[in-house]
Amino acid sequence: MGAMTARARTFAAALTSVLAVTACSSTTQPTPVTSDSVPTLTTEVVREYDRGKDAFTQGFEIDGDVLYEGTGLEGSSFVRRTSLDTMTELDRVDLPSDLFGEGITVDGDTLWQITWQDGVAIARDRDTLAEQRRVNYDGEGWGLCTQASADRLVMSDGSSTLTFRDPTSFDAEGTVNVTLDGNPVERLNELECADDGSVYANVWQTFDIMRIDPETGAVTAVIDGTPLWNSMSASQRGGADVFNGIAQIPGTDRFLVTGKYWPTIFEVRFTDTAPVGQN
């Protein structure tokens, strides 16, 4: 996209949100992606956590016993720390009203937070969320995660491309194009760098999560999150936006997943068979 004024960006974001909510609330849901070459997995719900509908979730990550979350929309963006044990908010910092927050990730003592079309990455203290410095980058910012084994950050920009960045300078160090059956997978959104080296990515305006080999860009599994949306009541779905937010619980095979303005965080496993009672 070309340059936009703050008012135009806010209007575009609001319109996008309305369209996304309409799409998700429609009786015609997005059709899950399928492939003959990679497995389609589903979600086994282990536990559900209730929360308010105040979070336009853009970044979602667990470090130790803390859940970090970054949210979006100009004038409403914030980043917060939440206790993983009690799901109570520990700290919260609002972004300046002209910034549209996007993905977040923790690397060492630093929490990185990117922005949508502002070209600004903010380095924060992991424990206090205090801003330490800012770095400029080109293009849009959508999702972000830390691949510690490779000493790099992985960033999405809404296309099929993942960009690798230096965790200290935030300089771009390379890219990979994400493909499924040889075709590019566009609209990659929130990211999670998992313990096994895979990168998980929400696909915007769908209930799909792609499991990606970051070395080749090949999708190795497609996860269908539709049952999570279907499990919520009509009142829970009211005002809820798109599926977005993946955070692995360290050292386990479980993940926390949610969506923008979703009132529920789901603790799930990704399995190849739907548990009895889920559809």
Identify the residue ranges that each predicted region occupies.
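Beta-strand-rich domains and repeat architectures in extracellular enzymes and scaffolds
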Residues: 46-78, 92-105, 142, 259-263
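Short loop/turn segments that connect beta-strands within beta-propeller blades
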Residues: 82-87, 125-129, 167-170, 213-217, ...
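Surface-exposed loop and turn segments in beta-propeller and other repeat-based domains
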Residues: 47-50, 90, 94-97, 175-184, ...
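Conserved beta-strand positions in repeat-built beta-propeller and related beta-rich domains
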Residues: 68-74, 111-118, 153-159, 201-205, ...
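Beta-rich, blade/repeat-based domains predominating
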Residues: 53-64, 97-108, 137-152, 182-197, ...
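C-terminal motif of bacterial Sec signal peptides marking the signal peptidase cleavage site
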Residues: 20-23
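A short helix->beta-strand "capping" segment at the edge of beta-propeller domains
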Residues: 33-54, 84-90, 235
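Bacterial signal peptide processing site
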Residues: 25-28
